[in-house]
Amino acid sequence: YLQYVVESRPTFFTVWLGNADLLQFVTSGGTRPLTEVGTFSANVKLLFDALAEQGARGVVTNLPNPTLVPLLMRPSELAAYRKDTFTPYWITTGAGEIRPATDEDRILMSADSIGFLTRSGFPKGFFKIAPLGNDDVLDADELDRVQQATAAYNATLTGEAGARSWPVLDANALFQKTKTGYLDFYGNRVETDFIRDGQLLSDSIYSVDGLHPNARGHALLANEFIAVINKVYQAQIPILNLSQFEGPRLAR
């Protein structure tokens, strides 16, 4: 990819690196490794050096907190969504401990077979003898690890961009704001969660996989890029109206 960047001779760029390095850990319940900070930093520097050598200008984006994606649910949220009254859920932590889940942990929305009988004869997730697997859960320690990695990656991105006088789009702050919800310039409601009280919310910026932005989410991100480009590079690109872009929907 680095060679491709050099050969393409870019004059303008947008860079958003590192999401996959974090999300491979998140989506696997912490069973897949995080990219070492040193490796991430070295790769960022190589790419940024290649872009700078071309004399290109652009926008660098930092990384949002990956633990805010709808894929991850607090046990209390999952119980309300599933209408489970027999709780707590039992989980297997990254350290191999089997214990009741707390709201300091997150259970993946994709966790399968919850409540189905296991070989032990007990329903999965509701008894110590039949806990959710480590790959179904991000326990409190794993959440801390991925948040520390996010902070380290962002320090690299911000530092390397600043050394070259490139602006940084603060996607981390943006996604923190969408978690609580807000109204945009056009009065459109913007939020992260796409299910509330068992109902699908049309205002969410996420697809129903709980991980990737939908059309509405990509339009929101485009507006953030446009705002930075217009401000820093004195462009006059019009922003998008999110109401023209579809939110989450189930396949028919």
Give a label for each model feature:
Residues Y1-T35, V60-E77, G115-V137, S204-I205:
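Oxyanion-hole/transition-state-stabilizing segment in secreted/luminal serine hydrolases
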Residues V60-N62, V168-A173, Y233-L242:
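Surface-exposed patches in mature extracellular/periplasmic domains of secreted proteins
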Residues E53-R57:
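A short helix->loop->beta-strand "cap" motif at the edges of active sites that frequently abuts
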Residues Q3, G38, A42-K45, D49, ...:
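Solvent-exposed, polar/charged alpha-helical surfaces in well-ordered, non-transmembrane soluble domains
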Residues M73-Q148, A155-L211:
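Mobile gating loops/cap/lid regions near enzyme active sites that modulate substrate access
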